[in-house]
């Protein structure tokens, strides 16, 4: 590897010397690789002073590393990174991005490391390639897809160029998708349509978004796509004639008013036409006949003047004027929109914007790097600031969402929902999803404003908090001064923004966690005290930390919370504390202390007179069944000699087995007598079932049919309607217990039945 690198460095030095010599002999005109001519030509249009030599070097490196690799299409692999870089160049990306695009697959697919990349092309290129590489490591499954999208948002928030390269990568893959198996095509197309294309749209990359949508449409719905294409081709000639008539009329009106402008027809996109047919329920002719034009001017004043000219030529439709210049959509899209009644009584959609606004609309946040190298950063600065604010918001969401799928659902909603803009009392613009309420507005301003919101005014009038906002509304919210103020559970019924939903859900989850933590701590202390166990030895910070780690909880508070929520029983935790820090004398005292008097009498009446246990083959030794694991005939068992001289009998899978076997000299062999002489033994089963009317009746019927007595029962139901029921039965052996478990599992709505200890 080192010899190859030294050879590479030597050849690079020769090439560099040759290049300098060529410049001196040819007046600084260097002959480039003809394969790169289209890429370099496009790049120079946006960045005339760009250093093209680094692009040549990047291409040479990528070509060498991918040498011999063939794509599914049969083309050399180098055609893919070259195409990705060309797409990035077409939207005006900077030289660094193009270098990263050329090299974006080298680290993942070859032995070229990030260190090599940093050494050869610098840290910035390496960071971009690393970001793209991490996005490409996609596992299978829905959860993996959601986690990948989450990673994409994190990478994008750190440097949006990572997403630009990823989108360009996806666009070229979609263009060549026909060479993949149909199922892979469908999977990629659906992800593109649901996430990648909306992300491109949200970042203002309209031209890329349209193509991604149409390519996905062709793969997912080929028959519908072909029909739309045919209809468009059939209607195109008459539509083009009508459009030319309008453009000529508008151009003439602008010229008469001394407004220098370019008037263009707006193209119709196949997926957009299909969506309007589905969503609006309208015929193809109605949608396709809706003609649109775009007026491009030199400055903002002429945008408004151009709309004035259009309104003088045609009758404006009421309520259809939208000013996205003073209140940009998504923080990046700026334009004036209006709809008028055109020739022949057909609606005409008109947009007016400056040339810079048009470029921003087509290429979005990517335009920032064009301005950065040509006009200074100020032209695209506000768009970048607003877009970065949106990406920071997404970053907050992904941190707050414990479940990646929850984050993906929120992202999909935010990307696909229509937006409104409202104003704060100070005149600041706040973008919200359509149907948002004052509560959504409050959370958009600040989390604490949302939590403490108690009232609102819209346009100076007091309104209910569930009132729906409209674009242009001026919103003022009133907050409580109470430090403990919080949201209402009822808000979850009407808020629509992902941020508001997440913040409200988190608040109640935190409130529940605190309640569970206190309840869990109290429950554990109560079990220890009730059992007469040494509090000073068991209930310490170090002992609790040990048990929390053993039970796979991150800390002691998490363990207390789990006890309080019912995820684990306090008795089970005490059993583990005893196994690690207690001794047999503590255990015996605890069993007596926590056993009800009536049960203790019944237990002694059976176990001491006829436990059915042979100790070392003899029935004469006093033995009693351990309450910690409740063995019944048929269980594998062992004996442990107590300090009082008796023998406690445990199941071999008892939770205390590890602690007891630390004193092997006290372990004795025990076995079940062949005849139990009619004795019964306690066994506890826990079942989980869908909560429904008649569940307990059904379970009772099954138990009665098995002729088994119930000595204790308790139950609780979770928020997701899962009922957990615990029964203690008097059974003769494991055979009867197993039959009972089978019949309970077969009961309608029962998910699972399993055996537990008396407290575990």
Swiss-Prot record:
InterPro entries: ACT-like_dom_sf, ACT_dom, Beta-grasp_dom_sf, HD/PDEase_dom, HD_domain, NT_sf, RelA/Spo_fam, RelA/SpoT_AH_RIS. Residues 77-174 form the HD domain. Residues 418-479 form the TGS domain. One of its GO terms (molecular function) is GTP diphosphokinase activity. CDD domains: ACT_RelA-SpoT (cd04876), HDc (cd00077), NT_Rel-Spo_like (cd05399), TGS_RSH (cd01668). The keyword Phosphoprotein does not apply. Coiled coil: none annotated. One of its GO terms (cellular component) is plasma membrane. Pathway: Purine metabolism; ppGpp biosynthesis; ppGpp from GTP: step 1/2. Belongs to the RelA/SpoT family. PANTHER family: GTP PYROPHOSPHOKINASE, GUANOSINE-3',5'-BIS DIPHOSPHATE 3'-PYROPHOSPHOHYDROLASE. This is GTP pyrophosphokinase.
